[in-house]
């Protein structure tokens, strides 16, 4: 599949200038440069606490700037909690962590009304989901009812407590983790909820060099404090989100994205039969929307006011891996 008719073109002929995109004012060079400086400040501070894990950093930045949520899959001990809290501190945002368990109730997440016998009135206590950055640890251990409450908060950016609706703070980023090894006592995330995550990334082990650097910093005391001073403000993040929505996407790239998503639904038109039959359901139109969001944020992170085919390709695995449903092994045998 090629981007329009240009094959593997990634050069500066993208985008074709002067074509309207209906997105409002274009980004000027000064705004792009300022965005690059803000992203570099966040990245530098993040890297001071989280050694290696460039792919994780990219996923978190794309999720934050693209206005989406991120699903993290990895074994324990790969700095997911540290990464989430560091990102929140870096952008002067509130942070909360929820350890998901089977007995976790929706009210434990979104909050509840508490009766005050002295005054005879109810007061509302907001739950931990009412933070700028929320880490849902082992989300697949929570019950379906609790997952549904999380879904409302993630998708609608609001939570209903009693008869009143409370908006989530802005910016609002949910990071959810899954352990691929220990699946006993877990609840499979419904596809509808998986689809609400902008990205899914698999956090890998650090390289030997990164692990040595981690130990070196640990011995020197550089990692003793888990907090970092903020280097940008929440208002800066909201500005970056607005800027991301103004990143230019050429018409040919929109067709390229739709071609990719279409290929997941009609694998027989693009893949050998033995491979095509392994995929039961392809990606929904929400995947195409996620591609645009992620590619725009990825372009802005790299200091550009327009999306290149490379941005789309860089996001392809993170956007698609949780949206494709393979055929059950029993159906293949």
Predicted ranges, named:
Residues 220-328:
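Basic, amphipathic alpha-helical bundle interface domains used for macromolecular binding and assembly
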């Amino acid at each position: 599949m090629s981007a329009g008719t240009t094959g593997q073109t990634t050069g500066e002929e993208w985008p074709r200038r002067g074509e309207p995109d209906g997105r409002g004012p274009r980004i000027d060079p000064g705004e792009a440069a300022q965005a690059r400086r803000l992203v570099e400040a966040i990245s530098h501070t993040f890297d001071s606490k989280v050694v290696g894990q460039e792919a994780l950093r990219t996923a978190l930045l794309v999720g934050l700037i693209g206005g989406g949520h991120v699903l993290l899959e990895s074994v324990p001990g790969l700095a997911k909690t540290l990464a989430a809290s560091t990102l929140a501190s870096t952008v002067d945002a509130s942070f909360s962590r929820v350890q998901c368990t089977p007995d976790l109730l929706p009210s434990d997440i979104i909050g509840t009304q508490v009766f005050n016998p002295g005054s005879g009135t109810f007061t509302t206590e907001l739950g931990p989901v009412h933070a700028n950055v929320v880490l849902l640890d082992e989300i697949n251990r929570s019950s379906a009812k609790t997952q549904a409450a999380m879904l409302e908060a993630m998708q609608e950016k609001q939570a209903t407590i009693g008869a009143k609706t409370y908006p989530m703070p802005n910016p609002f980023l949910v990071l959810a983790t899954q352990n691929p090894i220990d699946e006993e006592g877990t609840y499979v995330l419904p596809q509808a909820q998986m689809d609400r995550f902008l990205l899914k990334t698999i956090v890998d082990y650090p390289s030997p060099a990164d692990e040595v650097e981690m130990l070196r910093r640990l011995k020197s005391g550089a990692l003793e404090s888990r907090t970092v001073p903020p280097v940008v403000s929440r208002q800066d993040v909201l500005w970056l989100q607005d800027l991301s929505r103004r990143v230019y996407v050429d018409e040919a790239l929109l067709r390229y994205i739709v071609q990719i998503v279409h290929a997941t639904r009609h694998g027989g038109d693009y893949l050998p039969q033995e491979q095509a039959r392994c995929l039961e359901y392809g990606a929904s139109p929400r995947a195409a929307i996620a591609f645009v969001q992620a590619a725009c944020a990825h372009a802005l992170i790299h200091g550009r006011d327009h999306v290149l085919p490379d941005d789309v390709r860089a996001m392809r695995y993170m956007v698609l891996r949780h949206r494709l449903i393979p055929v059950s092994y029993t159906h293949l045998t």
